[in-house]
């Protein structure tokens, strides 16, 4: 009698999981506006048959028999857009690859078989969290009407574990019809269900969810506050700015991070003050997130705080601050600290500073840029050339002429283009 080998058996099925999101659409894509484009697959119906109950049972059973960490890794990979198409290697003696590929393609399609749907719905109540989540995501990600209907029904069941899993599946489905079901779930007595419903509403990106999600920002549970903040960031509605701002002072690091990231996603200038405050947070993770978020908000009023952050004790904060300065709207003058960063010991910061100076286009930085070119590494030379090309200050012409003879092709090309543009401008003036 041969002994069972659950781990190898699981890995055979796990191969199928790696691209569950690479479902092929039912028809070839429509023509684009470019009439030169042709597509032999236009109007051709492609294979759409999803897994039957036997395939689903084998997959779920393999997950249940696996190590919990491996199972969770597998479930996380559902929906992360891993594409199996880049791994077309010869099978050689690995004949099992051909069989697994055919099974993978079947599992990657939406589930429509009634028996398979019933098995997945039953698995929503599994004792193992990762099995519940796998079932929920397989039901939701296909966005087929019947699985979504089953998920909406499961959101009203008496088992809180099933309700939590159903909310996850509805988040993957992104079905606007589930909005009211998920909004009601925000008042669930089980906090895990509330958190998952908040997550799902963020995935729907429905502005109607702003008010109920804002109410969760006052929840006693920090994970609920953080999840609500993340969801509001996904929706990107500026009405949430004022309610998210105070959370940059929350006692929990995960809540502060979620609020800062959400404010960056919303890109409302009114968030500038809160993000500047977060730029001075004692936790380096918050400072990094704040620097990046200020670049996304693009308010030139943050220039002073970002310039000050160029002296932060953390290298990543300094780099992000330098980058953010180049992203601010209509910043007329380059901060002196950004210009000074051209001589920073860190080569990446030097390059970022040069690129940002190019975005700002301040001619007062030209002398420092020309000085920094001599002896600079290739990436910095390229950044300097791009920066000089963005200004009308002709004091940079000598460096551009030198760069036009650089051994690096990208530098030569960029410098030559800049010099040509200047000659054309001179001809126009004449």
PLM feature segments, named:
Residues 42-43, 74, 103, 135, ...:
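Conserved hydrophobic register position within alpha-solenoid helical repeats
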Residues 66-67, 127-128, 158-159, 189-191, ...:
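Short inter-helical turns and helix N-cap capping residues of alpha-solenoid HEAT/ARM repeat scaffolds
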Residues 11-22:
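Bacterial N-terminal signal peptides
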Residues 2-13:
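Bacterial N-terminal signal peptides that target proteins for export
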Residues 27-31:
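Boundary of Sec targeting at the N-terminus
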Residues 52-62, 84-125, 144-156, 175-187, ...:
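Amphipathic alpha-helical scaffolding segments comprising HEAT/armadillo-like alpha-solenoid repeats
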């Amino acid at each position: 009698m041969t002994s069972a080998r659950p781990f190898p058996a699981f890995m055979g099925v796990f191969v199928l999981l790696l691209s569950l999101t690479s479902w092929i659409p039912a028809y070839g894509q429509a023509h684009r506006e470019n009439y030169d484009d042709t597509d032999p697959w236009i109007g051709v119906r492609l294979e759409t048959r999803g897994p039957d109950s036997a395939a689903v049972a084998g997959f779920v059973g393999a997950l249940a028999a696996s190590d919990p960490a491996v199972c969770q890794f597998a479930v996380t990979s559902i929906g992360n857009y891993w594409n199996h198409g880049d791994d077309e290697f010869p099978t050689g003696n690995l004949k099992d690859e051909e069989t697994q590929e055919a099974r993978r393609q079947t599992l990657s399609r939406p589930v429509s078989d009634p028996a398979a749907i019933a098995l997945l719905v039953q698995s929503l109540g599994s004792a193992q969290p990762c099995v519940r989540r796998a079932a929920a995501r397989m039901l939701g990600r296909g966005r087929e009407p019947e699985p979504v209907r089953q998920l909406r029904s499961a959101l009203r069941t008496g088992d809180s574990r099933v309700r939590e899993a159903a909310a996850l599946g509805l988040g993957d489905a992104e079905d606007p019809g589930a909005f009211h079901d998920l909004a009601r779930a925000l008042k669930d007595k089980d906090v895990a269900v509330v958190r998952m419903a908040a997550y799902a509403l963020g995935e729907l990106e429905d502005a109607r969810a702003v008010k109920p999600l804002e109410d969760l920002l006052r929840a006693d549970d920090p994970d609920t506050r953080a999840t609500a903040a993340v969801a509001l960031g996904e929706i990107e509605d500026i009405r949430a700015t004022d309610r998210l701002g105070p959370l940059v002072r929350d006692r929990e690091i995960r809540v502060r991070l979620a609020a800062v990231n959400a404010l960056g996603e919303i890109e409302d200038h009114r968030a500038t003050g809160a993000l500047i405050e977060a730029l001075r947070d004692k936790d380096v993770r918050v400072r990094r997130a704040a620097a990046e978020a200020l670049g996304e908000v693009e308010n030139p009023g943050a220039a002073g705080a970002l310039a000050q952050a160029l002296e932060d004790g953390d290298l990543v904060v300094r780099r992000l601050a330098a980058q953010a300065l180049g992203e601010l709207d209509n910043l007329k003058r380059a901060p002196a600290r950004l210009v000074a960063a051209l001589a920073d010991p860190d080569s990446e910061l030097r390059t970022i500073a040069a690129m940002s100076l190019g975005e700002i286009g301040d001619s007062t930085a030209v002398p420092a840029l020309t000085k920094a070119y001599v002896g600079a590494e290739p990436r910095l030379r390229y950044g300097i050339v791009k920066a000089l090309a963005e200004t009308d200050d002709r004091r940079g012409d000598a460096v551009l002429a030198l760069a036009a003879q650089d051994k690096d092709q990208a530098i030569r090309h960029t410098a030559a283009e800049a010099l040509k543009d200047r000659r054309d401008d001179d001809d126009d003036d004449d």
